[in-house]
Amino acid sequence: MVRFFNALGTPVLAFFQYLGELVLLAGDTFRSIFTHKLRWKLFLNQVVEIGLLSQLVVVITGAFTGAVFAAQTFFQFNKIGMGSATGAVVSVSICRELGPVLTALMVAGRVGAAMSAEIGTMKVTEQIDALRALAVYPTDYLVVPRALAMMVSMPLLVAECIAVGIAAGYFVAIFMLEINGTYYMANMVRWTRNRDIIMGLSKAFCFGVLIVFISCQKGLAAREGAVGVGRATTEAVVNSSLAVLICNFFLTMLLNIIYPAGYQ
C-alpha cells in the first residue's frame, strides 16, 4: 500500500514542482522586464530568430491549411446546397482556431526546441555559472529578450498565417472548386468580424508566453551533458505542444463568452 501511494504521489509532486518552477521563472522574467534595462541587441536578434526566420514555415502551414480546409468544407456543405457558405466557415475557423493553434505548434517545434537546446547547452557547459560570476543575471540576459521577442512576434506570425490561409482558401474555392466568387466573399465578409481576429491574436499572445517559458525552463533545468540537453529539448517541444492544445480549449470557452461567434 505504501508503495502504491508513493508511486502515485511522486509524479503528482513532480508535476506541481514543475508548475512552481514555471511560475517562479515567469514572475522573475516579468519583474526583470519592468526593473531592468532591455538589452536591445539580444531582443532584436531574437525577433529575427523567432519572427523573421519562421516566415516560411508559417506561410506554408497557413496556405495548405486554408486550402485543404476550404476543399473539405465545400465537399461536405455542397451536399446540402450550402457550398457558398464555405468562405464564412473557412475564415472564421482560421481566425479563431486553426491559425493560432497550428502556428503555435510550428513555432514550438522550431523555436521552442532551439531555445531549450541553446540554453541547455549553456547550462551543462557552465556558461550560465560564468554569467553569474560576471554579475550578469541569467534571467535578464537569456529569458527576457526571448520572452519579449516571442510576445511581439507570435501575434504577427498568427496574423500572417490567418491572411495566407484565407487567401489560399479563396484561391481553391474560386479557381479549383468553381464556387461563385460573389457569394463566397459576401458570406465571408458577413460572418467574419473584428472579434474573430482579436480572439485569434489573443490566443497567439498566450501561446507565445507558454512556449517561451516552458522552453526556457527546460533549458535551465538541463543536466547530464549532451543526453540531458537532448532530453530537455524533446520535453520542451512535447510540453509546449500539449500546453498549447490544453490552453486552447480553456481560452476558446472563455473568449467565446467575451467574443461570441456568429453574425451579431
Residue ranges of model-derived segments:
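Active-site cofactor/substrate anionic-group-binding motifs, chiefly glycine-
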Residues: 46-102, 106
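Membrane-interfacial helix-loop-helix connectors in multipass membrane proteins
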Residues: 72-95, 163-205, 214-235, 254-264
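Short, membrane-interfacial amphipathic segments enriched in basic
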Residues: 1-41, 218-223
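Final/C-terminal transmembrane alpha-helix of multipass membrane proteins
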Residues: 229, 237-253
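Hydrophobic alpha-helical transmembrane segments that constitute the membrane-spanning cores
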Residues: 61-64, 144-173, 206, 214, ...
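Selective transmembrane-helix segments that form parts of the transport pathway or gating/packing helices
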Residues: 51, 55, 59, 98, ...
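Short cytoplasmic-facing helical segments at TM-TM junctions of multi-pass membrane proteins
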Residues: 119-144, 225-229
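Hydrophobic alpha-helical transmembrane segments of multi-pass membrane transport proteins
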Residues: 86-129, 214
